[in-house]
Amino acid sequence: MGGIGIWQLAIITVIVILLFGTKKLRGIGGDLGGAIKGFKKAIKEDNDKDSTQVDDKDSTQVDDNAKQPSNKKVEENIKEQSKEKDRA
C-alpha cells in the first residue's frame, strides 16, 4: 500500500517523456553512458598506476635487502671487535 506500484512508475515515465521528449532523454542517456565509461577508464588507469608503483617499491626493497649484511656477518664482526678490545 505504501510502496510505489507498477502503474505509478508507468505514469511517472509517461510524464517524464512528455516533459523532456525522447531526443533529450536519448542525449541524457548517451551523456550518462559516456560519463560512466570515462569513470571506469579512470579507475582502471589509477589501479594500473598503483600496481606499477607497488612493483617498483618491491624491487627497491629487494635491492635494499641485498645491500644489508646478513646477521651472521654482523655477529662475526661484533665478536671480532670484542676480541680485539679484549686483546688491547
From Swiss-Prot:
Statement: the UniProt record of this protein carries the keyword Electron transport: no
GO cellular component: TAT protein transport complex
Subcellular location: Cell inner membrane
Pfam families from the UniProt entry: TatA_B_E (PF02416)
UniProt keyword annotations, A-Z: Cell inner membrane, Cell membrane, Membrane, Protein transport, Translocation, Transmembrane, Transmembrane helix, Transport
Function: Part of the twin-arginine translocation (Tat) system that transports large folded proteins containing a characteristic twin-arginine motif in their signal peptide across membranes. TatA could form the protein-conducting channel of the Tat system.
Protein name, UniProt field: Sec-independent protein translocase protein TatA
Organism for this UniProt entry: Psychromonas ingrahamii (strain DSM 17664 / CCUG 51855 / 37)
